[in-house]
Amino acid sequence: MTRRLLDASTYAVLATVNGDGSPQSSVVWVRRDGDELLMSTIRGRRKTANMARDPRVSLCLYDPADPFQYVEVRGTVDMVEEGGNELIDELSRAYMSKPWKHRPAEVRLVVRLTPSKVVERVSVQSPSYVGRDD
């Protein structure tokens, strides 16, 4: 289920930790790169500052056709500028079927999430749930 959701250009919610310890969530585009996940952000955004200070994140994806199925990926991130514009173009084509409209003042970053834990859930309410006969 995890690879299927990631390969289907499913919107995801990225949770980071604010400086005061409170959670901060952002809807993001994501793609798989082997066992790691790539996202794009802009230098100066709150999530960017949060990840620079504390690289621990959680990413949640759910199946729009069956929201009772979801995947949570926990791990740490690193961010680099190299390839930032190329990644947002690739993600924009996957999610919007067109290239990204770049703004010269924006510095794009590649966010690479290295998973430490992956949690998959299928609720008993899901049409995909297969119960046990016991």
Task: Annotate each PLM feature.
Residues 50, 54, 124-125:
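Residue-level signal for well-ordered alpha-helical positions
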Residues 5-6, 51, 91, 113:
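A generic structural signal for nonpolar/aromatic side chains embedded in well-ordered alpha-helices
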Residues 68-134:
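Charged, gly/pro-rich active-site loop segments
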Residues 1-11, 127-134:
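Extreme N-terminal tail/first-helix region
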Residues 2, 10, 35, 69, ...:
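A generic secondary-structure signal marking the coil-to-beta-strand transition
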Residues 42, 63-64, 115-116:
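Short secondary-structure boundary segments
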Residues 9-43, 51, 57-61, 70-72:
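Short beta-strand segments
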